[in-house]
Amino acid sequence: MTPRAIICLAGPTAAGKSASTLALAQRWPLEIINVDSATIYRGMDIGTAKPSAAERAQVPQHLLDIRDPAQSYSAAEFRADALRLIAEIHARGRIPLLAGGTMLYYKALREGLDDLPQADPALRAELEARAARLGWPALHAELALLDPATAARLSPNDSQRIQRALEICRLAGQPMSALLQGERRGDAPSPYRYVTLSLEPSERAALHARIAQRFDAMLAAGLVEEVRGLHARPDLHPGLPSVRCVGYRQMWSYLDGDIDLDTAREQGVAATRQLAKRQLTWLRAQPERVIIDCLAGDAVARTVDAMARALPD
């Protein structure tokens, strides 16, 4: 029996996924499962380009505002939530559409997860305290001694991944690279076939211009004030996944007095461009990928046509 097809609308940041999603919802009885590690957080609306109340009124949207910024949300939790939602949406006679740009979530859903240790809050706090004293490059150098293969692919300032790699070394007693080469854990195979509609730019410079324009629009809409509200909370700090989101960590540094606003803006745009590059690298390796030029004037219409072809009769 052929597995049921599930459509994924993916693409780099600023590719126009939201506009395409709304157009698709006008034609089919969709429910959106958001594949985004930033829009899960309550109170983080401007910097995540979260769908507005009016947009949410047009189509049911799931996995928005499901965590406080002080909380974490793992790829394993996403996988369980997404599989549950897909089944529930099908049971209602509607069509699930996975939409977003967190590629680790897509990977977890398609392939299952590696048998890596769960996060340890106490150990993470210890690593964050050491990084505050020594800097993340020093911890990157430590990782290079423990797990050279992982350290070689990480920037010395990639705090989130350095922290996770060191955490795994400590908890598992062996390098993360060695664990990733081992057997995958016993996740049940996904009962679905995933078809990716991939919004990709035909010209990189044009996407970069879009990214800069969008970041400036977020600043004009009140991004600094949004982050200021988070910054005032004593339970939030730069080691949390929410604060490490692109745009938020740069504004946090500005509010800490480490950099001026112009520098924060430049760093935010640069970090968004780097994120888009990583997203595109992942997308280009996906099977059953239908490419749509997100810069085309009729990109939304092309997405609708691609969806019509991808859905089973």
Curated annotation (Swiss-Prot):
Matching Gene3D superfamilies: 1.10.20.140, P-loop containing nucleotide triphosphate hydrolases
UniProt-listed GO biological process terms: tRNA modification
Reaction catalyzed: adenosine(37) in tRNA + dimethylallyl diphosphate = N(6)-dimethylallyladenosine(37) in tRNA + diphosphate
A Pfam family it matches: IPPT
Keyword list, A-Z: ATP-binding, Magnesium, Nucleotide-binding, Transferase, tRNA processing
Residue positions binding substrate: 13-18
Cofactor(s) required for function per UniProt: Mg(2+)
EC number from the UniProt entry: 2.5.1.75
Site (Interaction with substrate tRNA) residue list: 102, 124
A GO MF term: tRNA dimethylallyltransferase activity
Record region (Interaction with substrate tRNA): 36-39, 160-164, 244-249
Family: Belongs to the IPP transferase family.
PANTHER family per UniProt: TRNA DIMETHYLALLYLTRANSFERASE
Function: Catalyzes the transfer of a dimethylallyl group onto the adenine at position 37 in tRNAs that read codons beginning with uridine, leading to the formation of N6-(dimethylallyl)adenosine (i(6)A).
Protein name in the entry: tRNA dimethylallyltransferase
Organism: Bordetella pertussis (strain Tohama I / ATCC BAA-589 / NCTC 13251)
